[in-house]
Amino acid sequence: RGVVFALAHIRGGSDLGRQWYLDGKLMKKKNTFFDFIACADHLVKDKYGALDRLAIEGVSAGGLLIGAVLNERPDLCKVAHLAVPFVDVINTMLDESLPLTVQEYLEWGNPNEKEAGHYMLEYSPYDNIGRKDYPAILVTTSLNDSQVLFHEPTKYVARLRAMKTDSNPLLLKCNMDAGHGGASGRYESLREQAYEYAVLLEQLGIGR
Protein backbone atom coordinates (compact mmCIF):
# COMPACT_ATOMS: atom_id res chain seq x y z
CA ARG A 1 0.00 0.00 0.00
CA GLY A 2 3.01 2.26 -0.22
CA VAL A 3 3.74 2.43 3.51
CA VAL A 4 7.26 3.39 4.64
CA PHE A 5 8.25 2.06 8.09
CA ALA A 6 10.81 4.09 10.05
CA LEU A 7 12.49 3.55 13.44
CA ALA A 8 13.68 6.67 15.27
CA HIS A 9 17.00 6.15 17.09
CA ILE A 10 16.50 8.95 19.59
CA ARG A 11 18.47 9.92 22.67
CA GLY A 12 17.32 7.99 25.71
CA GLY A 13 17.74 4.74 23.82
CA SER A 14 21.12 3.01 23.63
CA ASP A 15 21.12 2.46 19.86
CA LEU A 16 24.15 4.72 19.43
CA GLY A 17 25.97 3.91 22.65
CA ARG A 18 25.97 4.63 26.37
CA GLN A 19 26.25 8.42 26.07
CA TRP A 20 23.31 8.45 23.65
CA TYR A 21 21.26 6.84 26.41
CA LEU A 22 22.51 9.19 29.14
CA ASP A 23 21.68 12.24 27.03
CA GLY A 24 17.99 11.30 27.11
CA LYS A 25 17.31 10.59 30.79
CA LEU A 26 16.72 12.52 34.02
CA MET A 27 17.23 16.26 33.41
CA LYS A 28 17.94 15.63 29.72
CA LYS A 29 14.73 13.69 29.05
CA LYS A 30 13.32 16.36 26.74
CA ASN A 31 16.06 15.51 24.22
CA THR A 32 14.07 12.34 23.53
CA PHE A 33 11.07 14.38 22.41
CA PHE A 34 13.15 16.89 20.43
CA ASP A 35 14.85 14.04 18.55
CA PHE A 36 11.58 12.29 17.70
CA ILE A 37 10.09 15.50 16.31
CA ALA A 38 13.28 16.08 14.31
CA CYS A 39 13.03 12.57 12.86
CA ALA A 40 9.42 13.12 11.79
CA ASP A 41 10.24 16.48 10.23
CA HIS A 42 13.19 14.88 8.43
CA LEU A 43 10.93 12.25 6.87
CA VAL A 44 8.70 15.01 5.53
CA LYS A 45 11.58 17.20 4.37
CA ASP A 46 13.14 14.32 2.43
CA LYS A 47 9.74 13.42 0.96
CA TYR A 48 9.33 10.00 2.53
CA GLY A 49 5.87 11.18 3.55
CA ALA A 50 3.79 14.13 4.70
CA LEU A 51 2.53 15.18 8.10
CA ASP A 52 -1.05 14.40 7.07
CA ARG A 53 0.03 10.87 6.06
CA LEU A 54 2.20 10.08 9.08
CA ALA A 55 1.36 7.60 11.86
CA ILE A 56 3.44 7.49 15.05
CA GLU A 57 3.55 4.81 17.73
CA GLY A 58 5.18 4.20 21.11
CA VAL A 59 4.92 1.48 23.76
CA SER A 60 5.16 1.88 27.56
CA ALA A 61 7.79 4.60 28.14
CA GLY A 62 7.57 5.10 24.38
CA GLY A 63 3.93 5.95 24.98
CA LEU A 64 5.12 8.78 27.21
CA LEU A 65 7.22 9.95 24.29
CA ILE A 66 4.23 9.99 21.95
CA GLY A 67 2.04 11.73 24.53
CA ALA A 68 4.64 14.43 25.11
CA VAL A 69 5.15 14.92 21.38
CA LEU A 70 1.40 15.23 20.78
CA ASN A 71 1.19 18.02 23.35
CA GLU A 72 4.18 19.82 21.85
CA ARG A 73 3.38 19.26 18.16
CA PRO A 74 -0.18 18.00 17.65
CA ASP A 75 0.24 18.78 13.95
CA LEU A 76 3.09 16.28 13.63
CA CYS A 77 1.00 13.34 12.44
CA LYS A 78 -2.36 12.16 11.16
CA VAL A 79 -2.77 9.42 13.77
CA ALA A 80 -0.96 8.20 16.88
CA HIS A 81 -0.95 4.92 18.81
CA LEU A 82 0.01 4.89 22.49
CA ALA A 83 0.34 1.30 23.76
CA VAL A 84 0.28 0.65 27.54
CA PRO A 85 1.56 4.22 27.86
CA PHE A 86 3.27 5.73 30.91
CA VAL A 87 1.49 9.08 30.68
CA ASP A 88 0.73 10.18 34.26
CA VAL A 89 4.35 10.76 35.23
CA ILE A 90 3.97 12.84 38.39
CA ASN A 91 1.24 10.86 40.15
CA THR A 92 2.88 7.54 39.31
CA MET A 93 6.35 8.61 40.42
CA LEU A 94 4.97 10.05 43.67
CA ASP A 95 3.38 6.72 44.61
CA GLU A 96 6.13 4.64 46.20
CA SER A 97 3.72 1.73 46.74
CA LEU A 98 3.79 0.97 43.01
CA PRO A 99 6.24 -1.79 42.04
CA LEU A 100 8.50 0.23 39.72
CA THR A 101 8.40 3.75 41.15
CA VAL A 102 11.47 3.87 43.40
CA GLN A 103 13.79 2.01 41.03
CA GLU A 104 12.65 4.28 38.19
CA TYR A 105 13.97 7.35 40.03
CA LEU A 106 17.28 6.57 38.32
CA GLU A 107 15.63 6.94 34.92
CA TRP A 108 13.20 9.83 35.37
CA GLY A 109 14.15 11.49 38.64
CA ASN A 110 12.39 11.86 41.98
CA PRO A 111 9.47 14.32 41.79
CA ASN A 112 9.78 14.91 45.53
CA GLU A 113 12.94 16.86 44.71
CA LYS A 114 11.95 20.35 43.57
CA GLU A 115 14.08 20.71 40.44
CA ALA A 116 13.35 17.22 39.17
CA GLY A 117 9.64 17.53 39.96
CA HIS A 118 9.29 20.78 38.03
CA TYR A 119 11.17 19.34 35.05
CA MET A 120 9.05 16.17 34.98
CA LEU A 121 5.85 18.21 35.24
CA GLU A 122 6.86 20.18 32.15
CA TYR A 123 6.68 17.09 29.93
CA SER A 124 4.21 14.77 31.69
CA PRO A 125 1.64 13.95 28.96
CA TYR A 126 -1.37 13.89 31.30
CA ASP A 127 -0.53 17.20 32.95
CA ASN A 128 0.10 19.07 29.70
CA ILE A 129 -2.99 18.19 27.68
CA GLY A 130 -4.15 21.44 26.12
CA ARG A 131 -7.40 22.86 24.81
CA LYS A 132 -6.46 22.45 21.15
CA ASP A 133 -6.81 20.13 18.16
CA TYR A 134 -5.15 16.72 18.32
CA PRO A 135 -4.81 14.08 15.60
CA ALA A 136 -6.68 10.78 15.67
CA ILE A 137 -5.44 8.76 18.64
CA LEU A 138 -5.62 5.10 19.64
CA VAL A 139 -4.70 4.20 23.23
CA THR A 140 -4.40 0.52 24.17
CA THR A 141 -4.04 -0.87 27.69
CA SER A 142 -4.42 -4.13 29.60
CA LEU A 143 -6.45 -4.81 32.73
CA ASN A 144 -3.72 -6.95 34.32
CA ASP A 145 -0.80 -4.67 33.52
CA SER A 146 1.36 -4.42 36.67
CA GLN A 147 3.88 -1.96 35.17
CA VAL A 148 1.54 0.71 33.81
CA LEU A 149 -1.75 0.24 35.63
CA PHE A 150 -4.78 0.43 33.35
CA HIS A 151 -6.21 3.47 35.14
CA GLU A 152 -3.29 5.59 33.92
CA PRO A 153 -4.02 5.53 30.17
CA THR A 154 -7.74 5.50 30.96
CA LYS A 155 -7.63 8.79 32.88
CA TYR A 156 -5.37 10.22 30.18
CA VAL A 157 -8.02 9.48 27.54
CA ALA A 158 -10.77 10.90 29.76
CA ARG A 159 -8.88 14.17 30.20
CA LEU A 160 -8.02 14.34 26.52
CA ARG A 161 -11.68 13.87 25.60
CA ALA A 162 -12.65 16.70 27.92
CA MET A 163 -9.98 19.08 26.63
CA LYS A 164 -9.41 18.56 22.92
CA THR A 165 -11.21 20.83 20.47
CA ASP A 166 -11.30 18.59 17.39
CA SER A 167 -13.65 15.82 16.24
CA ASN A 168 -10.93 13.31 15.35
CA PRO A 169 -11.35 9.76 16.68
CA LEU A 170 -10.01 9.07 20.18
CA LEU A 171 -10.18 5.35 20.91
CA LEU A 172 -9.43 3.46 24.12
CA LYS A 173 -9.11 -0.33 23.90
CA CYS A 174 -8.52 -2.41 27.03
CA ASN A 175 -7.52 -6.07 26.80
CA MET A 176 -9.32 -7.66 29.75
CA ASP A 177 -6.98 -10.67 29.94
CA ALA A 178 -3.49 -9.39 29.12
CA GLY A 179 -0.61 -7.81 31.02
CA HIS A 180 2.02 -5.25 30.03
CA GLY A 181 3.15 -7.25 27.01
CA GLY A 182 -0.32 -7.50 25.52
CA ALA A 183 -1.98 -10.67 24.32
CA SER A 184 0.22 -13.74 24.79
CA GLY A 185 -1.48 -16.34 22.61
CA ARG A 186 -0.06 -16.66 19.11
CA TYR A 187 -3.24 -15.87 17.22
CA GLU A 188 -4.64 -13.48 19.81
CA SER A 189 -1.45 -11.45 19.56
CA LEU A 190 -1.78 -11.30 15.79
CA ARG A 191 -5.43 -10.23 16.04
CA GLU A 192 -4.45 -7.49 18.47
CA GLN A 193 -1.74 -6.20 16.15
CA ALA A 194 -4.07 -6.42 13.14
CA TYR A 195 -6.62 -4.23 14.93
CA GLU A 196 -3.98 -1.62 15.75
CA TYR A 197 -2.68 -1.54 12.17
CA ALA A 198 -6.24 -1.38 10.83
CA VAL A 199 -6.95 1.75 12.88
CA LEU A 200 -3.75 3.45 11.72
CA LEU A 201 -4.26 2.53 8.06
CA GLU A 202 -7.90 3.62 8.12
CA GLN A 203 -6.91 7.05 9.39
CA LEU A 204 -4.24 7.29 6.69
CA GLY A 205 -6.90 6.60 4.08
CA ILE A 206 -5.48 3.25 2.97
CA GLY A 207 -7.47 0.93 5.20
CA ARG A 208 -9.08 -0.94 2.32
Residue ranges and their predicted role:
Residues 1, 7-208:
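Active-site-proximal cap/loop segments of hydrolase catalytic domains
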